[in-house]
Each structure stands twice: as C-alpha cells, then as structure tokens.
C-alpha cells in the first residue's frame, strides 16, 4: 500500500459525530481504524468491479489480525434490493457477525447505500465504514447517514438513517473512473454550489477542464470534493433526519427521481440531477423566483462539462406520477426545493400541474 496522505478532514457533527477523510493511499488508515475499533470481523460489501481493491484491503485487514467476510453484491442499482440485503444478512448470520464488528461499504453509491442499510438493520445497528470509489458516492451517497434500497414503488423508499463510523475518500480512485462517471458525479457538486457555495460555481465557470481532471495534479477535483462534502457535512450535522434544513440537499431531486423511476434506474443519478436542476430552475423562473441570468447560469455550467440539460418530450404524465410519490411531499402537494439566488433557498409548495408541464416543456427535446 502507498503511504497515506490526508489532504482535508471534514468533521460532521450530530448525535454520532464522524470524520470524512479526503486524501490518497488511505487503505492504511482504513485498516488502522478497523483494527483499533475492537471488532473481530470485518464484512466488506462490494460489487464485482471492486474485487481487486477488496482483495487488497482484505489482505491488509487479515495482516492486522481481523477476520474478513466478503458480501458480494450485483453492480449498480440492481444490488439495492430487499433480496440482496437478505442474502447479506444470511451471510452475516452464518459468520456469527456480532455487534462490535464492522461493515465496510466499498464502491459506488449503490454499494455504500446498501452497506449502510445492511449495517443499520443487522442487530439493530452495527458500525459501517464507507469507502466510496466513485465521484458521486464521494460527495453524496457515502456522506450523511442516509441508507436505502429500491422497490417497485420508487428509489430509496425503504431505508434508515445510520451515520457511518468514518468515511475515507481516496482521490487516487478518480483516475480509474470513466469520464462519464466524473461528469455525472459533478452534478451533485454543482448542486452544492448553487445552494451554498458560489466558489464551486466559479471554479466550473473559469476552468471546466480542471474540474474534470482525474489525475490529482492540476485538478480542481480535490478542492471541489472538499467544498461539496463541507456543505453536506454542515447541513446533515444540523439535521440528520431531513426534518427541515437537510431538504436543501434535494435541489433538483424531485424531478430527477421521477426520471430515474421512468428509466428504471438506467440513467446515471448525476445526469438525472442535472436535468432536475434545469427543471426546477425553469419552474422557478416561470414563478418569478429567479431571473433569466440565473436560469442561463444553470444551463451554461451544466452544458460546459457535458451534463444533460434537457429530457425527451412526451413523458410528462409518467414524470408527474413519479413526482407525486416523492418523499418530500406533504398533504398531497408536490414540494420542490428552489432558489431565489445562489445560496438563497426556498420551497415551492403545490405548484399547478399546468406550471409543472410548462417547466417540463421548456426542457424537452
């Protein structure tokens, strides 16, 4: 293993505080954390694409005197099902996995979501260390304590709030990712820029290529990851269970989740969020909440790095049905997180179906 180097640490407050470590060569620190925890066993939950990384981590954990169990799950959103979670619990039971033991979620957002849910439910809650390997998971899924699985009714409708013991973001993993994964993950970073950190937007506007550069030297990605995690950590530290403030992290997500449901989760989450931000920006402009320059700023920033800014036409009824199922809805009203300016967040409650259709048509192709 290469020597560990930490660039930044974000401390997340709350009922169970934890640290998010951002750096390179972090396997050594992951092993140290597990070895000092009092655990006898570590279960690494990972997808086939992570087999090599999991094997490397396995060897280091065994060398530190820990027993290692592998929970192999299907790639992508296919693994986030009750059936797969049940198989994981069966394996934990067969290994006599105890309350002091630790689950490690290794992989993209689907793996970290599932690992958190498996850990939250096993013995009413065992510790989980999140090791995200995609940009999306680094800035979104692995931070914040939300866990969940998908059902036929929608995405992440079954889950639990379960804060991780620690999160380790290794920027060396970025170089292994396809360009499309970097682009899609950037949508969640841009989202945090619009809701809370204008410097994120400035970086994308002044040098979009550096914001996508996977090799750390000369890349803005380490700073963008740190800034995005800082925003999310501050929010969830004040409101873990999304009773008020945490809702702002759902900017663009109401429409995005409807798109994902319609696409049977085949769309990358970040791409759906990009289109979702364009939808809510258009709705906000129509309702007089934002001006035309801010609407155009959404489009230009997203388009500059290759994110989609439109969605296919003729699908409004299906998308409307998806939006009516959103978890943020209250009293039968569809609710949206919206902006009045960069860093100034508000809510739109129960907009008319006609206004929603108009916003949809503005982004249809």
Curated annotation (Swiss-Prot):
| List of residues binding Zn(2+) | 188, 253, 269
Reported EC number(s) for this entry are 4.2.3.4
Write out the GO biological process terms: amino acid biosynthetic process; aromatic amino acid family biosynthetic process; chorismate biosynthetic process
Q: In which pathway does it act?
A: Metabolic intermediate biosynthesis; chorismate biosynthesis; chorismate from D-erythrose 4-phosphate and phosphoenolpyruvate: step 2/7
Q: Residues that bind NAD(+), according to the entry?
A: 75-80, 109-113, 133-134, 146, 155
Keyword terms of this UniProt record: Amino-acid biosynthesis, Aromatic amino acid biosynthesis, Cobalt, Cytoplasm, Lyase, Metal-binding, NAD, Nucleotide-binding, Zinc
What does the cofactor section's free text say about binding? Binds 1 divalent metal cation per subunit. Can use either Co(2+) or Zn(2+).
| NCBIfam families reported in the protein's UniProt record | aroB
The name on file for this protein is 3-dehydroquinate synthase
